[in-house]
């Protein structure tokens, strides 16, 4: 196996075996806290949909369908026409004005930087990347390498085999990319690879002496009034380029509006018209369900339209013929353009749809649209069931044999009074449980892997009821995450992951499962990210708890991303030996990964000396 495959195998193995800690990539805290106090600059003018030629009823129907679909998990939506915001909705618990991870949507911004660099005559499309970085590859190896140009990186046709999975293999991503093997002839086949974009970012740094973020701040972000953003770097200090950017929805809309305006903003030409033209042209066909690829952006279904696209639902859709921009942030379970969310949007803006210049104002329809957005923002229009039944598989775990019937009765009785959750809170308050398996983190695996911020493992969970507020505390490594829990509406909190602070909103519900066992259901939303932690805590009669962990988007996405690796590992003798079995099949490996992604663990009461003093009676 190649070095990067070995590294991925090692990561997967450590997860399966329950090992905590870091990877082969050096970790350093870099994410700043969200700048709440920063003044937002250059906000768009707000207008009614009708004043810009579109019905409020259309947006109301679109938002209802996006919210109701079981295949979508909407976070933010914004629509602009003629440079004015005509619809905006933030789905609970995601607040207005909060930055959001963009994933690959930011590739299009890196493409803009390359266009600027070419306009400044510091770079050419046909330059060989091996000539740009002569010190990163030895002369002998270079003789046998094909020419890979800047344009090949822009169109995802480099053929380089070092891809996203390789970033866990070490700190030198640029060197690994330049020395990796090449599949086929560069420029002939579309092979989506985020490391192509990373190398484009490295080229900006090589030619300017600045990181991509530093280069773009005075040329793009500053002129657009974009002040609330952060872009991660690799261990070598190179901006990731193809992922790792946090950006607000309205600022995403500015980047779309900039292209609608042919690169001009407030009278200043930020991106050349030539680059707008060439980057938004289809340079090659792509897989089924998509419409072609330009320079770091995708073509859309509507003729002349295009899109900045990031996985799980981060999109800026530009419709030049309608002078319109749509922005989405979501946590869908799908990649790229062939997804339910975009198909719903295409349904409301089909090829034959042509909005009017202006429509008569409709105060009633507009009022209903605003009410709907308010309900969605407050979580009052949630069409998704939170029922336990049929959604969580039961796992067999060992149980301790001590019992406290009085405590168990009080917990059970409290759940039987759904109108009085305070009795349940009092029943569990002050109790701390020690985890028998201590390798699970508060952050979803998506967050841990994408930010190279791996868990130290949760060792204890405790409950506190104080002054009418309920808290669940998770002891992870040396840090205690004390999260306020809201019932009916998520409560805001924060977790500290090795010096990086992530804002969360925690929603709770007391219920019983199909076996009549009392359960506390927690949904911990990482509001700057695409993901949620789902934690179900079952209170058993033996005075212990069982905790079932899940995340969304979860198992399906993670297993799909690891499919090629697990298939190869299943037949690898060394890997089988490490797992203690010389006949590990792909099916068994997938089952082990499923249990790793959705574990069930047991906790036992740390001290029961206060049990008899707990009183849940009114």
Model features per residue range: what roles?
Residues 1-95, 118-123, 363-436, 445, ...:
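N-terminal leader/targeting segments and the immediately adjacent pre-domain N-terminus
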Residues 216-217, 221-280:
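Active-site-proximal binding-pocket segments
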Residues 158-233:
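A small/polar active-site loop signature that marks catalytic segments
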Residues 276-328:
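Active-site Gly/Thr loop motif
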Residues 432-554, 560-567:
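Substrate-recognition/cap regions that form aromatic- and gly/pro-loop-enriched pockets
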Residues 83, 101-126, 153, 200-204, ...:
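Active-site SXXK
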Residues 120-158, 179, 210-243:
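Active-site helix/loop module of the DD-peptidase/beta-lactamase fold
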Residues 196-203, 241-264, 314-331:
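Active-site-proximal alpha-helical segments within enzyme catalytic domains
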């Amino acid at each position: 196996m190649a070095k990067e495959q070995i590294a991925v195998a090692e990561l997967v193995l450590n997860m399966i075996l329950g090992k905590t800690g870091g990877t082969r990539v050096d970790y350093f805290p870099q994410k700043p806290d969200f700048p709440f106090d920063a003044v937002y600059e250059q906000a768009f003018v707000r207008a009614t949909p009708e004043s810009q030629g579109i019905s409020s009823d259309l947006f109301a129907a679109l938002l209802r369908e996006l919210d109701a679909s079981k295949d979508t998990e909407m976070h933010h939506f914004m629509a602009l026409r003629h440079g004015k915001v005509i619809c905006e909705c933030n789905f609970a618990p995601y607040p207005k004005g909060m930055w959001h991870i963009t994933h690959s949507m930011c590739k299009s911004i890196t493409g803009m930087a390359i266009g600027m660099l070419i306009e400044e005559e510091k770079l050419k499309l046909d330059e060989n990347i091996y000539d740009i970085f002569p010190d990163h590859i030895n002369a002998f190896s270079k003789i046998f390498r094909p020419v890979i140009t800047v344009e090949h990186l822009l169109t995802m046709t480099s053929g380089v085999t070092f891809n996203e999975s390789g970033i866990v293999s070490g700190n030198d991503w640029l060197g690994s990319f330049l020395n990796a093997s090449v599949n086929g002839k560069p420029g002939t086949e579309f092979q989506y690879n985020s490391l192509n974009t990373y190398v484009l970012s490295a080229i900006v740094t090589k030619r300017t002496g600045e990181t991509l973020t530093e280069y773009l701040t005075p040329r793009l972000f500053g002129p657009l009034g974009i002040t609330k953003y952060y872009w991660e770097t690799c261990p070598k200090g190179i901006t990731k380029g193809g992922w790792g950017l946090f950006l607000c929805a309205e600022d995403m809309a500015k980047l779309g509006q900039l292209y609608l305006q042919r690169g001009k903003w407030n009278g200043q030409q930020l991106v050349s018209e030539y680059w707008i033209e060439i980057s938004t042209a289809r340079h090659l066909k792509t897989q089924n369900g998509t419409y072609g690829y330009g320079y770091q952006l995708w073509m859309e279904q509507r003729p002349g339209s295009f899109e900045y696209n990031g996985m799980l639902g981060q999109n800026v859709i530009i419709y030049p013929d309608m002078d319109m921009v749509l922005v989405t942030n979501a946590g869908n379970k799908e990649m790229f353009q062939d997804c339910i969310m975009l198909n719903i949007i295409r349904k409301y803006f089909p090829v034959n749809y042509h909005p009017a210049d202006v429509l008569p104002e409709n105060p009633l329809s507009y009022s209903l649209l605003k009410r709907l957005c308010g309900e969605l923002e407050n979580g009052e229009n949630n069409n998704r069931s939170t029922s336990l039944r049929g959604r969580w598989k039961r796992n067999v775990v060992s149980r301790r044999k001590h019992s406290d019937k009085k405590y168990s009765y009080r917990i059970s009785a409290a759940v039987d009074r759904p109108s009085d959750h305070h009795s349940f809170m009092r029943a569990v308050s002050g109790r701390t449980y020690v985890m028998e398996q201590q390798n699970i983190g508060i952050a979803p695996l998506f967050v841990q892997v994408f930010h190279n911020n791996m868990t130290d493992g949760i060792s204890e969970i405790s409950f506190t009821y104080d002054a009418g507020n309920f808290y669940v505390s998770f002891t992870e490594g040396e840090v205690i995450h004390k999260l306020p829990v809201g019932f009916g509406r998520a409560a805001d909190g924060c977790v500290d992951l090795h010096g990086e602070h992530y804002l969360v909103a925690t929603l709770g519900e007391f219920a019983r499962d199909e076996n009549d066992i009392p359960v506390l259901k927690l949904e911990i939303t990482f509001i700057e990210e695409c993901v949620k932690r789902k934690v179900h805590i079952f209170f058993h009669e033996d005075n212990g708890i069982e905790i079932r962990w899940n995340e969304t988007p979860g198992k399906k996405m993670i297993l799909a991303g690891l499919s090629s690796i697990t298939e190869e590992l299943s037949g690898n003798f060394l890997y089988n030996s490490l797992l203690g079995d010389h006949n590990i099949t792909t099916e068994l490996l997938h089952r082990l990964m499923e249990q790793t992604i959705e574990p069930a663990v047991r906790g036992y009461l740390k001290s029961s000396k206060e049990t008899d003093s707990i009183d849940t009676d009114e």
